Amino acid sequence: MASEDGLAPGRVLYHYTNAPGFLGILERRCLFASDVWFLNDASEVRYAQTRMAERVRQYLGPDQPWLQALLELSEAKPGWLDDVFVASFCEEPDLLSQWRGYAAGGFAIGFAADGLAALGDGPGAPRLVQVDYGAGSGRRRLRGLFEQLADGGPYSAEERERLARTVLLPEMARVKEPSFAEEKEWRLLVVESRPERILFRPGATGVVPYVEIALPDPSPVREVVIGPAADQQLHRRGVEQLLARRGYDGIEVRESTSSLRL
């Protein structure tokens, strides 16, 4: 299982998206993970860098020079996260802030969490992780990682950088400010540097790098929530036809009860 977090049996996680994103996911049977720098609020990456640097400082010691390498990399190489791609999910199926921020006139696709966690194993496989909110979250897990690495030295400069990337990239991509805690976010993380795997699409920030994450058969899609819209019944009719004609069986379709008006 490519997840390090506890998943309750039967848990469903929701990906909020607009109509083009919804069609892309169901027609192509894949998820689209965006470069972490091109998420809706890029300041969250800078926040994560600051928090990570603070945590690394807590563990610096004279007999652990590789921790100094971690600190230098987390502070001095902002381009470090260029290889990290994220697909976001929410525990809540009908959250007003998610409709307003990510999917006005769109949909929330419910995925079986265990299906997402099982998308791959080994280096480079997608990892399903729960987002940490605030400076204090994740400290126990990070301490365990540091202790594990410290016990395995000494390392060459190249090995230290590789290990630092292995530790810091996923950790930095799962940290957000406490003000976002309402989202109860989970992320599917992919570390990908091969040029041929990186695609591009237009977005609010211009040209957005992304990678595709293939979904298995049978599909982990369990539910579709029709977002706030002027005519939800018409939206529902289109969704039900798409699901039926593309072989998505047993998918629950329901309508948002959000007070958002478009």
What is each PLM-predicted segment?
Residues 1-262:
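Partner-binding and oligomerization surfaces adjacent to conserved cores of proteins
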